[in-house]
């Protein structure tokens, strides 16, 4: 294993801490969360809300890497007008490059996102995180972010995650 390449990949991944979420920037959120903060939020939801029939460890791994490709392609949102297939191809190419030089193969985790029971659960937690963050920013900064909540609700199945996303207002922060 080449330690110089491994070190480069580890350092590059840390840049997710500085990459702001594009949707929040577009809406004028002050000090928007980073992609890394979002990934932590998704992992937190997976850890706390994981049902018994889902492999928690696998779901956590998927949650941690689900937006890793954004290091190279940026945080592409539906408002950017990028064809979803083109976005997926860009992200796959970026992820493949980022996966080289690591002591573990991360490709199965990114391929599972949305495509296995664990991956679908993580994707649902991704939408829940967006809705909860919209509620939080709306309460703290007085912004109208209902479109983010509505987008999440449109993609969430009935049940606990949808109920949490639909919350009328967050508790006192």
Model-identified regions with their sequence ranges:
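Active-site helical microenvironments for divalent-metal-assisted chemistry
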Residues: 1-173
